């Protein structure tokens, strides 16, 4: 391998190390994100499992409460304690009889006759088991069980029906007579009287009071629009508004037309080092270097294998040493060509909202509005002030008096109301009025709010001893628990003993036939069966 190739290998190694460093940073970031995702998933699974467990426990507790309510209802319907004892005695006798049936029967010993004085014979074989005996008499009734725990508080009862309407109460004593009220408003004018005889023409009476105001007239039509007024003075600049929220990014618009080439800009700052260019072509092979000084003799090597390798005359392969160290990196390659134009970047973020502009000119007046509806009739106005007294007229002639006597005199308008009169004396108390008729039944009111919970009920009776339940099914395996904390690092273990030497391996497969060796010396040494020169040949 030449120096150029070694240089190329060194460059690749340097790039590989740089890439490896970048890959290590990315792998660390990926591992951290995966750990956070796994932790979030574990927490969500744990919360779901906790909710499921709480739901199961709540359902079980509800079932137990329902069972206790049913037992309490049964005890309430059972009746007095005597009936409960009469019901429980036959059940207890039956249970005791079943227990006594299972007990083993003891056989009573029989007396041997006294006449036989023979020596006892050899022991006989064991007899067969006897038949099952009759059931024994029932045993005594057991003691009363321990009192059970207090029952849970009962649910509040349903609200009772609404009661009937109560009877009306007695009439109270008659109160004192009230004081006279204020004078009422003046009454309406009476009907006109009958036509009287024509009277003499009297003097002109005083001028009457002004009549009530007439009804409010309908609003007039809207006037025509006046001429446009002069523009008002310019307003003061307003306070700049607060910065608005960032708007939602809009979709990128269509690409605009290609602009004209711009002028050459100022020289930019030094750019950041670019990414490494593509791998250069391998350089030319350099000249062979000068031979270095001879190295120091190496340490004694380990004992070689005793396996005989047939080199078949390949002396160079037998004398070939280990591969040398890696050479220095080669010279840098030629810089690559300029790349193509990149893709357009993403649209920028919207800028901040600008300051508020100046106030604009006042707008033109709007068109006239529609005609409004007629308003309601207004209240009567206050009476007007009395007018001035008129001048006295001239005396009329006799003919004028006769003609005036024949005219119909119409009654004048009523005068103003007089002042209120003095308060009257207190009247005599009147007789007691009769009782009024009974009123109709009122409509039923709305349903009232729920009543307070009732007092705690008395403790329930002692429950009956329950029968032994069946063996429950094995529960389902529980969920996996949360992973425990990471344990501390253990102590360093002692160094193990040196292992025994392994068994020598099998003989390898015979290799391919080697290439022909170099030409021999003037006096070639004879070759042995292993392909090496005969010992002692090189010393001649």
UniProtKB/Swiss-Prot annotation:
It comes from the Eukaryota. It is a single-pass type II membrane protein. Residues 1-28, 109-304, 316-540 are annotated as: Disordered. Residues 1-34 are cytoplasmic. The keyword Lipoprotein does not apply. Pfam families: Collagen. This is Collagen alpha-1(XXIII) chain. It comes from Homo sapiens (Human).
């Amino acid at each position: 391998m030449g120096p150029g190739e070694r240089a190329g290998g060194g460059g690749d190694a340097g790039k590989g190390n740089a890439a490896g460093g970048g890959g290590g940073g990315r792998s660390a970031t990926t591992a951290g994100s995966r750990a956070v995702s796994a932790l979030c998933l574990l927490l969500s699974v744990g919360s779901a499992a906790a909710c499921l467990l709480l739901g199961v426990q709540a359902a079980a507790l509800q079932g137990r409460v329902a069972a206790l309510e049913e037992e309490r209802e049964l005890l309430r319907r059972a009746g007095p304690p005597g009936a409960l004892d009469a019901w429980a005695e036959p059940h207890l006798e039956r249970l005791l009889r079943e227990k006594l049936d299972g007990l083993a029967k003891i056989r009573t010993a029989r007396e041997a006759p006294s006449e036989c004085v023979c020596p006892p014979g050899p022991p006989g074989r064991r007899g067969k088991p006897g038949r099952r005996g009759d059931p024994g008499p029932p045993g005594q009734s057991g003691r009363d069980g321990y009192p059970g725990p207090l029952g849970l508080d009962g649910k509040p009862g349903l609200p009772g029906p609404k009661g009937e309407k109560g009877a009306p109460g007695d009439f109270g004593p008659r109160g004192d007579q009230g004081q006279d009220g204020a004078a009422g408003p003046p009454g309406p004018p009476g009907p006109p009287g009958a036509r009287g005889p024509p009277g003499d023409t009297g003097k002109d009476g005083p001028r009457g009071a002004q009549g009530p105001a007439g009804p409010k007239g309908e609003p007039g039509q809207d006037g025509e629009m006046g001429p446009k007024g002069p523009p008002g003075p310019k307003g003061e600049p307003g306070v700049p508004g607060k910065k608005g929220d960032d708007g939602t990014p809009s979709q990128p618009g269509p690409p605009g037309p290609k602009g004209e080439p711009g002028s050459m800009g100022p020289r930019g700052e030094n750019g950041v080092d670019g990414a490494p260019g593509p791998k250069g072509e391998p350089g030319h092979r350099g000249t062979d270097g000068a031979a270095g000084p001879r190295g120091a003799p190496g340490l004694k090597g380990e004992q070689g294998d005793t396996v005989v390798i047939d080199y078949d005359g390949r002396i160079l392969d037998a004398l070939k040493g280990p591969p040398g160290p890696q050479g220095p990196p080669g010279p840098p390659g030629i810089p690559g060509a300029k790349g193509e134009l990149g893709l357009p970047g993403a649209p920028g973020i919207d800028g901040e909202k600008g300051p508020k502009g100046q106030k604009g000119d006042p707008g033109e007046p709007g068109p006239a509005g529609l005609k409004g509806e007629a308003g309601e009739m207004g209240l009567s106005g206050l009476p007007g002030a009395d007018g001035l007294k008129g001048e006295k007229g001239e005396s009329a002639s006799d003919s004028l008096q006769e003609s005036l006597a024949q005219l119909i005199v119409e009654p004048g308008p009523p005068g103003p109301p007089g002042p209120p009169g003095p308060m009257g004396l207190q009247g005599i108390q009147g007789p007691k009025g009769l009782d009024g008729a009974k009123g109709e039944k009122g409509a039923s009111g709305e349903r009232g709010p729920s009543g307070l919970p009732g007092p705690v009920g008395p403790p329930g009776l002692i429950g009956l001893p329950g029968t032994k339940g069946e063996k429950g099914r094995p529960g389902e395996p529980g969920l996996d628990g949360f992973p425990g904390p990471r344990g501390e690092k253990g102590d360093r273990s002692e160094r193990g003993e040196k292992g025994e030497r392994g068994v020598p391996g099998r003989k390898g497969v015979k290799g391919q036939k080697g290439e022909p060796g170099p030409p021999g010396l003037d006096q070639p040494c004879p070759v042995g069966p292993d392909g090496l020169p005969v010992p002692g040949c090189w010393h001649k």
